[in-house]
Amino acid sequence: MVIAIPGMDSFKEVNVALANDRWMQRGVAVLSIDGPGQYESPLLGVYVSMQNWIDAGPAVVDWLLGRPEIDGQKIGVSGASFGSFFGTILTANEPRIAATAVISTCLEPGCHTIFEEASPTFKKRFMWMSNYTDEAKFDEFAKTLTWEGHVEKIRTPYLVVAGEADELSPLEHTERMVRAMSGPRQLVIYADSRHSVGNVPAANLGPFPPAPRSLSPKPSAAAKRTSPSS
């Protein structure tokens, strides 16, 4: 069972293919969500905040455990782009998550690069997602967006796939986060790839990182570069 979390300007439907879905082909059920602040959530008065994402994990897992077809010992999380941050916070604060895999990272504490050096539409959208109209107040809020003090609690397998030249979240922040973790973890870096991992030889030719074994019984090739695991 995978809880799939989209990015900042994405939506839950994009995470589940109508045919040939990679999770479903492996016999893994998918719950694709719009979490706090994502897509239609602001229209319902549910905005991005650290506390809302901390609370999201128990709410989602409790709902899943109410379904008899779900194996409560094998609930994982996947996240892409800003979903990498949201999924990390959810995992850190929900011990029933068995494994987590994220890609195309947004893991810079405070999010300075994506909000101040990239397209201004990113900041404008996130202000709407978090219910801010005053930019100065939003800038103070953005400082609270951090994995620091959270990832240290993650004890289950964690996979992160990043582009070496990520222009929205410098790689150094992802590397620092991985060093701060104490559980089993793997960092895969694709040479020359930007934020959206792919369309470079390293990503197109592989090898490709394996899915966390706690979610999939099918082994895959070894990853290109990995961090030490504990």
Model-assigned labels for residue ranges:
Residues I89-E140, T156:
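Hydrolase active-site cap/lid region
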Residues S193-G206:
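Catalytic histidine-centered segment of alpha/beta-hydrolase-like enzymes
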Residues M8-D21, G35, E172:
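The serine-hydrolase catalytic nucleophile loop
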Residues V178-S196:
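Catalytic histidine neighborhood in serine/cysteine hydrolases
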Residues I154-R155, V160-A162, D166:
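Short beta-strand/loop motif that positions the catalytic acidic residue
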Residues Y47-I70, I89:
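Alpha/beta-hydrolase active-site loop
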Residues P68-S81:
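Alpha/beta-hydrolase fold nucleophile elbow
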Residues T156, P170-R179:
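Short alpha-helix in the alpha/beta-hydrolase fold that links the catalytic acid
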